[in-house]
Amino acid sequence: VRRGYFECRFGQLHVHNAIPPGGGFEEGTALLCLHPAGLTGRSFKGLLPQLGRDRSVYAPDLPGSGESDGPATRASVVEIAAGIGDFLDSMRFRQIDVLGYQQGSLIASELAIARPQQVRRVVLVGVPPTTEGDRLRQIGQPVFIVRPKDELWDSTPRAREFLPRARALDLPQLGANLFETSADAAIGPIREFLAG
């Protein structure tokens, strides 16, 4: 796992990444991982090396988190998504898959809506309660909703109401911070969905 800095509208964006041993040639679609509020891209330290075997995986510290510069004033989910979009533009991704965990799932949703040609597949893990069901309904890409037994266990099923065609997986055996360790019960099905 490596780290680097990239420019975005808020300043520098600190990014953790894993690249396949072959240097990224003949790999699957790159994956962008967006962390929960109060955490950093390090919350994916168990996922990065596993999924990074066959695709490039990027886990930025969201603007204002960890080692990333933040906005001068509180930013909306749409504004944070636009800042992450700056990173996608600087990397010149033609297509990318996006995984959002808790608050990161809201940002992932906004990226999917704003960039329908670029975002190929969306994984939403532990979806916060939202009154933005109409926004979720605008996601046109294939969606996989993963429900670990965390503080959002009760709210995550509501996302299924807004996304009735989404695949869904309940993981009552896995709790909060499931990607900080090797969570094969989650990573295996995510890998399978992304390969589809």
Model-found features: residue ranges?
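Alpha/beta-hydrolase fold catalytic core
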Residues: V1-L31, D54-R55, R167, Q173, ...
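Conserved alpha/beta-hydrolase "acid-adjacent" motif
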Residues: E151-P157
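Catalytic histidine-centered segment of alpha/beta-hydrolase-like enzymes
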Residues: L174-A183
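Acidic beta-to-alpha connecting loop that harbors the catalytic carboxylate
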Residues: P148-E151, Q173-G175
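Active-site loop/oxyanion-hole signature of alpha/beta-hydrolase fold enzymes
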Residues: Y58-L99
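Short beta-strand/loop motif that positions the catalytic acidic residue
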Residues: I139, I145-R147
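Conserved HGGG/HGGXW glycine-rich cap/lid loop of the alpha/beta-hydrolase fold
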Residues: A18-E67
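Conserved hydrolase catalytic core segment
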Residues: R94-T130
